[in-house]
Every structure is written in structure tokens, then in C-alpha cells.
């Protein structure tokens, strides 16, 4: 019965991280989404194996032991808890071992000999890259999330598909997820994330999916959506926010520090302004500001009798003239 019914993908979009995949698995277990009952037939593959389609199947009920789609894929590479494959320009010749080519663009055979070099193809991530050109710079982290280490190690098909797979076990039964996407579709934000689908709002993976798996990498916390689409923008804003806020709070502190530093330097200058004039008597008489008569008689140094009789009024002793004179000027 299932062989005659048209096959439909489980979900349309892009699976960015492990949490996205667990949401899809949970939606299938709870009945919000559906497992596929079989593999696509040859006549269906052209319409079903395309960017954005995601298939989830349960191994026992479907009888699927190996998912086939008639596309020539590169060897798999690990990316977190996923396996990545990239579509090849042409399949490997029969009997040839699938070896990655070296840095010089030449591939080695199983016997260790060198075959003729083949031009490298790469998805044009960087501006100015065209078909046949090599990477001039190392791909960014966002690009690594899309192709992993499958950059230019094989003869990849230009604008070819990427296959991304992940598996879980629930109550002893294996469940598999197979997704397809074009790199440019993900970069352009054309493939929605599971959290963007209204049907999947409020879907929380059950405990068995979170703790009962043998994942290679820890499950991401609070990271949903694609790496380049709008669904991932809140996380990007959260990363840039801590950089901006401290700078605004630190700016007034940095402005206050240079203002406070010169203040103690100017204060001693204000106190010691009479020093450049070298009026030592003024420095001695600063603590004796209460004696106004002495300050009034400063401009009359020639009148010695007046200076001698000033201490007489304060000190009536007859033998105190030399002592009062010394106290007044020295």
C-alpha cells in the first residue's frame, strides 16, 4: 500500500544543529510530522532529492537498511553529530579507491601512483571565485558549518547538493534523518529552520532523545536555526551585544580618569604659586596670616626702628630686641 502512495518529504528546510534534528525527531514521534515509509523510486528521485527536502524513517517499520538516491557522493566527513557528503562531478571509476587529492590537485591511486591531475572545483563562497579556481582564503566558520572539511579534496559538482544525516535510537529502534541542501540556498536564507515552522512551535524533545543517545558532541544549548538565515540572527546579536555595552559603560570611566589624574597635579601648583617668585619671607609668614601688622610693614624694610619696636609691643622684655628681630625675619 505504501509503495503505491506518493512519497512526501518529512520536512522542508535546513537542519542547523543537533537541537534542530531532535525537534524533527520529536515531531515525528508525537505525530506532528510523519516518517517516510520507503525509499524514493527511480522515477521519484528527480522531484524528491532536491535542496530543502528532509526525510526521516524508522528502520524497523520501513525496512530501509540503506538510504539510496542515485547520486554520486563523496566519502562522508564528521561535523559534530552529523555526517556530511557532497555531490561529485562524476562517480569514481570502478575499482578505484576513494582517495582525497593532495594540495597539488593530484589524486593518488590505491597502489600509491599518481594519476593525472583534475581541476579543483569549489562552491564559490568567496567573492571572485569561479569554477575551477582554488580557495585563496580559508573558508569562514559559517561555511564550515555547511560543508565541513569537504572543501576542495574531491571533484565536487558545481552548485551540487550536500547531504547531511544523523541517527538516534528510541526504545531500541533506530531512526534516521537525511537532509539535502544547496549551500547558496542556506546562505540566502531560503530554507527555514524547524523553529520557524508554526506546526513545531512548542515542540520540546523528550528526555530519552536528549540523554539516551551516543552523540559525539554535546547537544547545543539554545542554538536553533540556520547559521546564515534570519533565524540565527538573535544569537548573532547576543554575541555582539556584550561587546558594545561594556564599551559604553567604560567610556565615562575612561574620561573621568584623565580628568582626575591632572587635578592632583594642579592642586600643588596652586598652593606653590608663590614659589616661582622666590619670596621666602612670604612662605614663612603663610602660617602667621593672623599678624596683619607684620604684613602691612613688609613694604618698609628701611625703617628698622619700626621693625624693632613691633616685637616690643608683643614682648615687653628689655633684652629681647635681637631675639624678636630674628623671629621676625628668619
UniProtKB/Swiss-Prot annotation:
<feature type="compositionally biased region" description="Polar residues">
    <location>
        <begin position="105"/>
        <end position="114"/>
    </location>
</feature>
<dbReference type="GO" id="GO:0003677">
    <property type="term" value="F:DNA binding"/>
</dbReference>
<dbReference type="Pfam" id="PF09729">
    <property type="entry name" value="Gti1_Pac2"/>
</dbReference>
<keyword id="KW-0843">Virulence</keyword>
<keyword id="KW-0010">Activator</keyword>
<feature type="region of interest" description="Disordered">
    <location>
        <begin position="239"/>
        <end position="306"/>
    </location>
</feature>
<keyword id="KW-0804">Transcription</keyword>
<comment type="function">
    <text>Global transcriptional regulator of pathogenicity. Acts as an activator of parasitic growth. Not essential for colonization or penetration of the root surface, but required for expression of genes encoding effectors that are secreted during infection. Involved in conidiogenesis, but is not required for conidial fitness, overall (colony) morphology, vegetative growth or carbon source utilization.</text>
</comment>
<protein>
    <recommendedName>
        <fullName>Global transcription regulator sge1</fullName>
    </recommendedName>
</protein>
<comment type="similarity">
    <text>Belongs to the MIT1/WOR1 family.</text>
</comment>
<dbReference type="GO" id="GO:0005634">
    <property type="term" value="C:nucleus"/>
</dbReference>
<feature type="compositionally biased region" description="Low complexity">
    <location>
        <begin position="250"/>
        <end position="306"/>
    </location>
</feature>
<keyword id="KW-0539">Nucleus</keyword>
<dbReference type="InterPro" id="IPR018608">
    <property type="entry name" value="Gti1/Pac2"/>
</dbReference>
<keyword id="KW-0805">Transcription regulation</keyword>
<feature type="region of interest" description="Disordered">
    <location>
        <begin position="93"/>
        <end position="123"/>
    </location>
</feature>
Amino acid at each position: 500500500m505504501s509503495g503505491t502512495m506518493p512519497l512526501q518529504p518529512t520536512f522542508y528546510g535546513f537542519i542547523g544543529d543537533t537541537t534542530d534534528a531532535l525537534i524533527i525527531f520529536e515531531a515525528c514521534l508525537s505525530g506532528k510530522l510523519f516518517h517516510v515509509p520507503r525509499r524514493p523510486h527511480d522515477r521519484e528521485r528527480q522531484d524528491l532529492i532536491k535542496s530543502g527536502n528532509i526525510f526521516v524513517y524508522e528502520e524497523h517499520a520501513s525496512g530501509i537498511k540503506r538510504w539510496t538516491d542515485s547520486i554520486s557522493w563523496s566519502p562522508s566527513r564528521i561535523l559534530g553529530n552529523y555526517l556530511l557528503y557532497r555531490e561529485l562531478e562524476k562517480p569514481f571509476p570502478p575499482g578505484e579507491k576513494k582517495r582525497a587529492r593532495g594540495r597539488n590537485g593530484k589524486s593518488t591511486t590505491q597502489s600509491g601512483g599518481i594519476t593525472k591531475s583534475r581541476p579543483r572545483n569549489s562552491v564559490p563562497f568567496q567573492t571572485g571565485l569561479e569554477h575551477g579556481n582554488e580557495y585563496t582564503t580559508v573558508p569562514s566558520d559559517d561555511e564550515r558549518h555547511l560543508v565541513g572539511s569537504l572543501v576542495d579534496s574531491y571533484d565536487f559538482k558545481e552548485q551540487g547538493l550536500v547531504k547531511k544525516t544523523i541517527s538516534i535510537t528510541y526504545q531500541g529502534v533506530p531512526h534516521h534523518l537525511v537532509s539535502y541542501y544547496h549551500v547558496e540556498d542556506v546562505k540566502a536564507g531560503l530554507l527555514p529552520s524547524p523553529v520557524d515552522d508554526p506546526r513545531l512551535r512548542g515542540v520540546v524533545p523528550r528526555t530519552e532523545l536528549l540523554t539516551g543517545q551516543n552523540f559525539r558532541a554535546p547537544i547545543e544549548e539554545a542554538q536553533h536555526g540556520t547559521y546564515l538565515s534570519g533565524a540565527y540572527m538573535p544569537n548573532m546579536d547576543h554575541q555582539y551585544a556584550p561587546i558594545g555595552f561594556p564599551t559604553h559603560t567604560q567610556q565615562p570611566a575612561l574620561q573621568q580618569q584623565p580628568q582626575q589624574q591632572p587635578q592632583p597635579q594642579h592642586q600643588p601648583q596652586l598652593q606653590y604659586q608663590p614659589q616661582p617668585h622666590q619670596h621666602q619671607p612670604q612662605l614663612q609668614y603663610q602660617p602667621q596670616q593672623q599678624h596683619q601688622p607684620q604684613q602691612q610693614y613688609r613694604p618698609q624694610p628701611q625703617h628698622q626702628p619700626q621693625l624693632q619696636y613691633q616685637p616690643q609691643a608683643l614682648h615687653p622684655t628689655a633684652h629681647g630686641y635681637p631675639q624678636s628681630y630674628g623671629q621676625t625675619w628668619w
